[in-house]
From Swiss-Prot:
Gene name as annotated: PTP-2
Enzyme Commission number, as recorded: 3.1.3.48
InterPro entries: Dual-sp_phosphatase_cat-dom, Prot-tyrosine_phosphatase-like, Tyr_Pase_AS, Tyr_Pase_dom, TYR_PHOSPHATASE_DUAL_dom
Keywords noted in UniProt: Hydrolase, Protein phosphatase
Source taxon at top rank: Viruses
UniProt similarity note: Belongs to the protein-tyrosine phosphatase family. Non-receptor class dual specificity subfamily.
Protein name: Tyrosine-protein phosphatase 2
Keyword Hydrolase: yes
Organism from which the protein derives: Orgyia pseudotsugata multicapsid polyhedrosis virus (OpMNPV)
Domain (Tyrosine-protein phosphatase) ranges: 3-154
Amino acid sequence: MYEASQIDEHVFVGGYYGDNEAMLRFIENHAIASVISLIDSDVAPIRHALGLPVGDHIHVYCEAAPTCAALPNAMPALYDYMVRRIGEGKRVLVHCYAGASRSAALAVYYLMRSRQMPYQDALNAVQSKRRVAINDHFVRFLATRCSYRFVNDELKPQIV
């Protein structure tokens, strides 16, 4: 059985447990059209099992190690990809191995940018849907994405 958590209407966060058939059933049952894999291994077995068209399965080779900058460097492009796919009416599954750090970090970033919300609010929103434990180096990256500006005499977050 494959499990992922629905973060909002279009975004799901999950792990990868090696059961490609269960993952396929999950994406079919939830009408998911795009998958983002944030893992440090070959995704050919996943890609083959899911049978998604080219461009519907994105892989960022990403380690959980603090020295890995692949995910922070890719987050703006992944966000743009997610927004484009969602704009096409598609649902997106973001997964890493446990579904707790890398994929959760991207989900938090997605909420921060799409809703212009501070890190802690976005983290709370994701945590309300799924148990997460984002690695410190991803937390530091996410926390630095938020600045504030005045709009109509109100202090508003601005996410970059």
